[in-house]
Amino acid sequence: MNEFKRFEDRLTGLIESLSPSGRRRLSAELAKRLRQSQQRRVMAQKAPDGTPYAPRQQQSVRKKTGRVKRKMFAKLITSRFLHIRASPEQASMEFYGGKSPKIASVHQFGLSEENRKDGKKIDYPARPLLGFTGEDVQMIEEIILAHLER
């Protein structure tokens, strides 16, 4: 979160002068716009640093079952699983519901997991789902300044 240190220095006093309901509205707007940005980036199959995701492992030709043709994480980044929360103190985004937090953390950090069919250990490459891009930081600054001008 070091990239937000400059926000703290410049805007802390101004943000604290807002009423609690104003801060909650600001954090709700920030969370909503950040979720949209994350969803667009994940649908483009890109990490926050702009590199493309590692492709899925190839399945053998004989095993046509189990093939997945849609883009990775298409369902995981919907608002059903990617929840936002806003309060006067903070805005947060988290994966919620069923297996989605575990799936997201395995791919975010490139962990290994046991296959549920045959018990083999599978090493997943890191595919960061959440993170800040340069455009996200700029968007946050613009939203805060626009909200303070109202």
UniProtKB/Swiss-Prot annotation:
InterPro entries: Phage_virion_morphogenesis (IPR006522)
Region (Disordered): 32-66
Database matches in Pfam families: Phage_tail_S
Highest taxon listed in the record's lineage: Viruses
Function: It is proposed that R and S are tail completion proteins that are essential for stable head joining.
NCBIfam families documented for this protein: tail_comp_S (TIGR01635)
Protein name in UniProt: Tail completion protein S
